[in-house]
Amino acid sequence: MSRFSVLSFLILAIFLGGSIVKGDVSFRLSGADPRSYGMFIKDLRNALPFREKVYNIPLLLPSVSGAGRYLLMHLFNYDGKTITVAVDVTNVYIMGYLADTTSYFFNEPAAELASQYVFRDARRKITLPYSGNYERLQIAAGKPREKIPIGLPALDSAISTLLHYDSTAAAGALLVLIQTTAEAARFKYIEQQIQERAYRDEVPSLATISLENSWSGLSKQIQLAQGNNGIFRTPIVLVDNKGNRVQITNVTSKVVTSNIQLLLNTRNIAEGDNGDVSTTHGFSSY
């Protein structure tokens, strides 16, 4: 590596506060199987910068400045047609996407900020008539995500839908996209659920929805447990596949030791948010 390249990496590291964004990630559905999907999710997790781990779980950065805040995912459908998705590396939130020469962004301040750094060469920019909030997306789609099948075939359909603008259809497609990428990166269980749906679609399990609604709460309690002998200050109630409520009270739970893969930094969690937030993707602002 040349001294110029080394210097460039050092400058980037300083700019990002000591952490380097590792680059874009890609996933092709043509020929995809559970293994290749698992590698994609692993690549997505590895591309998210962090400085420390809490109970061996990567803690996402509280903030990143400029273009380094955004990771690009290149997703190809079965026909090889592609969209590029912009992801905020501090929370794994999807900000918008590029289809052909048109960029699309959620109608919210965070996405508007992202539009200043990604897809700048797009010939046309469209602001979607909704935010990335789960509740808003479900209203726009006309159905809750509990009734929208997910799987790799559904991801193919979502990509194909997003290639052409239809705000109602796009809302449902984005619900599929969020769960098969961002949520799968956050939780090993959700990744495995999608792997089981590599060749067929099925609605999300009750446990999947419960985990999606509880990521911020779990993240918060796991971080607080560091100063409380591993005990959660506020228990998190999850729902299993059979609809049974399960109380998580400490870091020895399997949800902590082998399921959750990324932690949202407490500096990005709304005060009073202890989980069970059914209307959001992660927490209250998305």
Swiss-Prot record:
Residues 1-23 form the signal peptide. Gene3D superfamilies: Ricin (A subunit), domain 1, Ricin (A Subunit), domain 2. Keywords: Glycoprotein, Hydrolase, Plant defense, Protein synthesis inhibitor, Signal, Toxin. It comes from the Eukaryota. Glycans are attached at N250. The active site is at E183. It is an enzyme of class 3 (hydrolase). PROSITE patterns: SHIGA_RICIN. Its EC number is 3.2.2.22. Pfam families: RIP. The keyword Lipid metabolism does not apply. The keyword Phosphoprotein does not apply. SUPFAM superfamilies: Ribosome inactivating proteins (RIP). GO terms for molecular function: rRNA N-glycosylase activity; toxin activity. It catalyses: Endohydrolysis of the N-glycosidic bond at one specific adenosine on the 28S rRNA. One of its GO terms (biological process) is negative regulation of translation. InterPro entries: Ribosome-inact_prot_sf, Ribosome_inactivat_1/2, Ribosome_inactivat_prot, Ribosome_inactivat_prot_CS, Ribosome_inactivat_prot_sub1, Ribosome_inactivat_prot_sub2. Residues 270-286 form a propeptide. Belongs to the ribosome-inactivating protein family. Type 1 RIP subfamily. This is Ribosome-inactivating protein momordin I. It comes from Momordica charantia (Bitter gourd).
